Curated annotation (Swiss-Prot):
The keyword Nuclease does not apply. It comes from Burkholderia vietnamiensis (strain G4 / LMG 22486). This is Chromosomal replication initiator protein DnaA. GO terms for cellular component: cytoplasm; plasma membrane. It is found in: Cytoplasm. Residues 1-71 are annotated as: Domain I, interacts with DnaA modulators. HAMAP family: DnaA_bact. Belongs to the DnaA family. One of its GO terms (molecular function) is ATP binding. Residues 71-188 are annotated as: Domain II. Domain I is involved in oligomerization and binding regulators, domain II is flexibile and of varying length in different bacteria, domain III forms the AAA+ region, while domain IV binds dsDNA. Residues 169-181 have a biased composition (Low complexity). Residues 160-181 are annotated as: Disordered.
């Protein structure tokens, strides 16, 4: 095991930049090798490094292990705080660095962030890293008994004095270790794996992604706030983490915080109980970027809404960026103060729709590739055709397929996929029917269901009928002729015209897009 790790470390040191090697590989340590099960366990000193190494380097380490032992090896990663103190195994000779395997990839990006952080730290060497907290802040940070902490990272001295941080990006020497990067992500609560590079883009989310990139490069200037809405599992959280990660790359030292709305509510309650609102406000009002997820959880919580309103006003006044996500359009969120709704509407509001077929296929293929599995296109198309709601559902289905294949020792095929997803496919087929779509659309537009089959052509009937045809094509497995038959025996070309017309207008008409979003969410329950 140790011989392999020396061999593996030496090769990775040649393949990676010195910064990448020191930050990600050197802190790892092999802890166990089970020859009977062909498993190798590698320890990482913290969760951040474990998640990053697992996502970025596990495939390469597994390849090297297979070459070394001449058999497939399953590489497992475990947490061990002492791993970072072990360093690289003795006897590993220094190697001349080569160009990184992925110079523009996420690992290189974090290395660049860490380098910028060192430059930022060296710009003010006399300032201490942290200052003692006030008594109320100490109460907020160090609680005992059943109470959890108010999740407010401490402010560096020069930030506490100035009220908010000044960005000081710039090149610098690589740090001796990844401690700065660890601290940066711990404070921001960002997931470094969620980047623009691994966000699968299609028609359903291309506007949201374009807006997110614009905001990431020009925070506080364009689209403030940026409000993203859509159903669960469509990529809202991925996008806002990607914005934060990109801003850290562009402007090292930016004060960023990702927080779920439920955690924000909890922090408000605890600050109220401990009379620690001064510290609470000082922290949230001094951010450069606030990313708040699922703001619909603020519904009915007046004190939380009041505190968020003050934070929002302070941040926008300071040209800090605010990004918000929700499961629905701002004006559709119940129990939210009108003045907050008006602030949400003052920026850019963008919907993220369920992924279209091609995008679903791309998501499945990329996820399978990240799992080291060669998924055939016919299997990917089969799954994508039957599962339409969101990315999480697709990824969950793929995990079921992979597990079923492994447990039964069979190659992945369409037949195996049907067996693995039998229950899921049955539920999907039972949930949405053309008849249900017709009734839902008729109720929504206040027309009779019989109008769906009739030959009437006034606009107030023809338009909902076209929308129902479009939804039938998108949400069921019916063919165009079958859909036409269910709409009063219409020709398949009529259905095709309706589908193309609504699909085209959806991308141009915000009101139509919103109505379709509401209908889709209603039909999917």
């Amino acid at each position: 095991m140790n011989d392999f790790w020396q061999h593996c470390s030496a090769l990775l040191e040649r393949e990676l930049t010195p910064q990448q090697y020191v930050t990600w590989i050197k802190p790892l340590a092999p802890v166990a090798f089970d020859a009977s099960a062909n498993t190798l366990s590698i320890a990482a000193p913290n969760r951040f490094k474990l998640d990053w190494v697992k996502s970025q380097f596990s495939g390469r380490i597994a390849d090297l292990a297979r070459e070394f032992w001449n058999t497939p090896i399953e590489v497992q990663f475990v947490l061990d705080p002492k791993a970072g103190m072990r360093g690289a195994p003795a006897g590993v000779a220094p190697a001349a660095p080569r160009m990184p395997l992925t110079p523009n990839g996420p690992a290189a990006a974090v290395a660049a962030i860490a380098a910028n952080l060192t430059a930022h730290a060296s710009a003010a060497p006399s300032a201490p890293a942290d200052v003692p907290l006030t008594p109320s802040a100490a109460a907020a940070h160090h609680l005992h008994g059943d109470d959890a902490d108010i999740d407010l990272p401490s402010l560096p001295a020069h930030e506490a004095a100035a009220g908010r941080r000044t960005w000081r990006p710039g090149p610098g020497a690589a740090p001796a270790n990844g401690a700065e990067a660890d601290s940066m992500y711990e404070r921001s609560k960002l997931n470094p794996v969620l980047t623009f590079d691994n966000f699968v883009t299609g028609k359903a989310n291309q506007l949201a992604r374009a807006a997110a990139i614009q905001v990431a490069h020009n925070p506080g200037i364009s689209y403030n706030p940026l409000f993203l809405y859509g159903g669960v599992g469509l990529g809202k959280t991925h996008l806002i983490h990607a914005i934060g990660n990109q801003l850290l790359l562009d402007k090292a030292g930016a004060r960023i915080r990702y927080i779920h709305a439920e955690q924000y509510v909890s922090d408000v309650v605890k600050a109220y109980q401990r009379k620690a609102f001064d510290d609470f406000k000082r922290y949230y009002h001094s951010l450069d970027l606030l990313l708040i997820d699922d703001i619909q959880f603020f519904s009915g919580k007046s004190r939380t809404q009041e505190e968020f309103f003050y934070a929002f006003e302070a941040l926008v006044a300071n040209k800090a960026q605010v990004i918000i996500t929700s499961d629905t359009y701002p004006k559709e969120i119940s129990g939210i103060d009108d003045r907050l709704i008006s602030r949400f509407d003052s920026g850019l509001t963008v919907a993220i729709e369920p992924p279209e077929l091609e995008m679903r296929v791309a998501i499945l293929m990329r996820k399978a590739q990240s799992e080291g599995v060669n998924l055939s296109e016919d299997v990917a198309f089969f799954v994508a055709k039957h599962l339409r709601s969101n990315v999480r559902e697709l990824e969950g289905a793929l995990r079921k397929i992979l597990a079923y294949s492994k447990f039964h020792g069979r190659e992945i095929s369409i037949e195996l996929t049907k067996e693995a997803l039998k229950d899921l496919l049955t539920v999907q087929n039972r949930q949405i029917s053309v008849e249900n779509i017709q009734k839902t659309v008729a109720d929504f537009y206040n027309i009779k269901v019989a109008d769906m089959y009739s030959k009437k052509r006034p606009a107030n009937i023809a338009r909902p009928r076209q929308i129902a045809m479009y939804l039938a094509k998108e949400l069921t497995q019916k063919s165009l002729p079958e859909i036409g038959e269910l709409f009063g025996g219409r020709d398949h070309t009529t259905v095709l015209h309706a589908v193309r017309k609504i699909a085209d207008e959806r991308g141009k008409d915000a009101q139509l897009n919103h109505e379709l979003h509401v209908l889709e969410q209603t039909l999917k329950g």
